[in-house]
Swiss-Prot record:
It is an enzyme of class 5 (isomerase). One of its GO terms (biological process) is 'de novo' cotranslational protein folding. This is Trigger factor. Involved in protein export. Acts as a chaperone by maintaining the newly synthesized protein in an open conformation. Functions as a peptidyl-prolyl cis-trans isomerase. GO terms for molecular function: peptidyl-prolyl cis-trans isomerase activity; protein folding chaperone; ribosome binding. HAMAP family: Trigger_factor_Tig. It catalyses: [protein]-peptidylproline (omega=180) = [protein]-peptidylproline (omega=0). It is found in: Cytoplasm. One of its GO terms (cellular component) is cytoplasm. Belongs to the FKBP-type PPIase family. Tig subfamily. It comes from Neisseria meningitidis serogroup B (strain ATCC BAA-335 / MC58).
Length: 437
């Protein structure tokens, strides 16, 4: 193979000029045309018997284009291997204006290479390790939430109070005119749950079934309905029904409803503590991991390959569209989401992927089979039949990709925590459970 020069363009972009001998192009084109001849069905000739000259006239140009494309791809691969180029993404090929060599056809390949990743001094980085505990008070709080989730509403003949579920008819007008979305029949909501604007709810409190009244409501300037934002409406409200909330007692029936077969309340509390502890642990680990990843990004000066960032942005866009489809938005698959929306997140992911790969390779942080099994077991623990979930993961090796990635990340977090300056941060139960995770 003739030597080629790799030209450095901007940042990670490189360029090589590939020379394809016309003798090779012509030979490969002839071979392709002969293959086409054997398959061709042309009027006036038996299948495969049309003259090669006719085949060349009909298919010669497209055959030559196919050959050039194939040779370019092959030659670029050979050059990348010979030059030990770590190509990121796919190259783009461009014609070369100066075709000064009549013996060959020249094509320029423009591509990006992976950046050199140099891990900085991790001991200079500060990392926040988040901690939280789950005790009796947190179990009590969770049990109370579970009680509220099983609230029963019973009809009462009295005025409406906060906490009641009410059913109303309402019609709103702005400057005496009805507006879109301003009216409804038999609309149910819970007073005090912030489902309606505060002035609207306050107007219903104290009403009895069968009563009607006008309530003035000022829509906030930042209200999601732009047509009514900042305007004042008068709602005519008729109260149809009032129901009082009743919470279940924490007894054997309640425990059975939560899956404790014998109705043992103590067992139920143990199960609640175990489940809540698992969720709290997951959330604090996520926050610690986020701090570790931020520290790694600070420790490494890195320019992510544009091609990989674009690929990741496209993947994130498709992921969002699929989520919309799964939520019932059938037309979401055709949404044209601008990739710029995802560029920042994509660049972060690509950069972290490169950093983690380097860190894992340099420090032998690949997870063991036991670590992967532990992650799978942790996934399975929250299901009714954990062994069925474990068997599902191990039935197809591709399903182990997610547990393996989590095990890798866990090893990286432990490694960085052992190197960096660690500041422990204790969070309350409410702070942990209120965090996005």
């Amino acid at each position: 193979m003739m030597s080629v020069t790799v030209e450095t363009l901007e940042n990670l972009e490189r360029k090589v000029v590939l020379s394809l001998p016309w003798s090779e192009i012509n030979a490969e084109t002839d071979k392709k045309l002969k293959q086409t001849q054997r398959r061709a069905k042309i009027d006036g000739f038996r299948p495969g018997k049309a003259p090669l000259k006719m085949i060349a006239q009909m298919y010669g140009a497209s055959a030559q284009n196919d050959v050039i494309n194939e040779l370019v791809q092959r030659r670029f691969y050979d050059v990348a291997v010979a030059q030990e180029l770590k190509v990121a993404g796919f190259p783009r090929f461009e014609g070369v204006e100066e075709q000064d060599d009549k013996e060959s056809f020249k094509v320029a390949a423009i591509f990006e290479v992976f950046p050199e990743v140099v891990i900085g001094d991790l001991s200079a980085q500060e990392v926040e390790k988040v901690t939280a505990s789950v005790g009796d008070a947190e179990v009590d709080q969770t049990v109370e939430i579970l009680r509220k989730q099983r609230t029963r509403f019973n009809h009462v003949e009295r005025e409406a109070r906060n906490g009641d579920r009410v059913i109303i008819d309402f019609e709103g007008k702005i400057d005496g005119e009805p507006f879109a979305g301003g009216a409804s029949k038999n609309y149910a909501f819970v007073l005090g749950a912030s489902q309606m604007l505060p002035e609207f709810e306050a107007g219903v409190v104290g009403m009895k079934a069968g009563e009607s009244k006008d309530v003035t409501v000022n829509f906030p300037e930042d209200y999601h309905g732009k047509d009514v934002a900042g305007k004042t409406a008068v709602f005519t409200i008729t109260l149809n029904n009032v129901s009082e909330a009743t919470l279940p007692e924490v007894d054997a029936d309640f425990a059975k409803a939560l899956g404790i077969a014998d109705g043992d309340v103590a067992k139920m509390r143990e199960e609640v503590q175990k489940n809540v502890s698992r969720e709290v642990e997951r959330r604090v680990n996520e926050q610690t991991k986020e701090s570790v990843m931020n520290a790694l990004l600070k420790a490494v000066e890195l320019k992510a390959p544009v091609a990989l960032v674009n690929e990741e942005a496209a993947r994130l866009a498709n992921e969002m569209k699929q989520n919309f489809v799964n939520q019932g938005m059938a037309d979401a698959a055709n949404l044209d989401l601008p990739l710029d929306m995802f560029k920042e997140q994509a660049e972060r992911r690509v950069s972290l992927g490169l950093i983690l790969a380097k860190l894992v390779d340099e420090n032998k942080l690949e997870p063991t089979e036991e670590q992967i099994k532990a992650v799978v077991a942790n996934f399975a623990e929250s299901y009714e039949d954990p062994q069925e979930v474990i068997d599902w993961y191990y039935a197809d090796p591709s399903r182990l990709q997610a547990p393996t990635s989590l095990a890798v990340e866990s090893n990286v977090v432990d490694f960085v925590l052992g190197k960096a300056k660690v500041n422990e941060k204790a969070l309350s139960f409410d702070e942990v459970m209120g965090a996005q995770a």
